[in-house]
Regions:
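Short acidic, glycine/tyrosine-flanked loop/strand segments centered on an H-E-D-like triad
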Residues: 84-104
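Alpha-helix N-cap/helix-initiation motif
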Residues: 105-109
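Short, well-structured alpha-helical interface segments that form or flank functional binding sites
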Residues: 9, 60, 86, 111, ...
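Acidic-leaning, charged glycine-interspersed low-complexity segments
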Residues: 26, 30, 110-164
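C-terminal tail/extension regions appended to the core domain(s) of diverse proteins
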Residues: 2-4, 151, 159-175
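Short glycine/proline-enriched loop/turn "hinge" motifs that connect secondary-structure elements
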Residues: 78-85, 146
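Small/polar-rich, solvent-exposed N-terminal microdomains that initiate assembly or binding
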Residues: 1-81, 173-175
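Residue-level recognition of well-ordered beta-strand positions that form the cores
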Residues: 66, 88-94, 155-159
Length: 175
């Protein structure tokens, strides 16, 4: 993958992984009308962009995925041209305070955000199909998002080529 093409590819892969994991789907516990199957979770409770909880009408939990390619001048630099970049994957697990207890899964004593972060960590950490090398959990912190919403933010890091060694059909040059 080259340059920014990793962003959409990683987001799509993670969204697919989340909706196809029965433990994660059960932990989200989506009660929104019109959600018939796991595909319906996309852009209702699993987003590939950041989401403001106040734009949602239901007491629920949702997950957002963002991918960033931060500047890092010292990483494997070759004079002025960097060979590698270190994309970060930021996953926000946001729950309304009334949805924090995991009442729908017996024997789970963690709150919903902590439990989901454990499941996501197990699913992603150490995998080698995101860029080059293994994806690594760098941070997993808890915070609140204004009144009524609690958040757990997970940050993973991977490595990728800054420029492709060859052009594939998904990486067409923009003129």
């Amino acid at each position: 993958m080259a340059n920014s093409s990793i962003i959409g590819k990683v987001k799509n892969k993670i969204v697919r992984d989340l909706i196809n994991d029965p433990d994660i789907v059960a932990a989200i516990n989506c009660q929104i009308d019109g959600v018939e199957d796991n595909e319906d979770l996309i852009n209702r409770v699993i987003f590939d962009f950041n989401q403001n909880p106040y734009t949602l009408r239901d007491v629920q939990t949702f997950i957002t995925i963002q991918v960033h390619i931060p500047e890092d001048r010292g990483f494997y630099s070759n004079s002025d041209k960097r060979v590698f970049v270190k994309p970060t994957i930021e996953i926000w697990i946001t729950s309304h305070e009334d949805h924090m207890r995991v009442k729908n899964i017996p024997k789970i004593t963690q709150n919903r955000n902590d439990y989901l972060s454990t499941l996501i960590d197990r699913r992603l950490n150490g995998r080698s199909d995101f860029g080059i090398g293994e994806i690594e959990l760098k941070s997993n912190v808890e915070t609140s998002y204004e009144q009524n919403y609690l958040v757990r933010v997970m940050i993973f890091e991977t490595k990728d080529l800054n420029n492709s060694l060859c052009i594939d059909e998904d990486d067409r040059e923009i003129e």
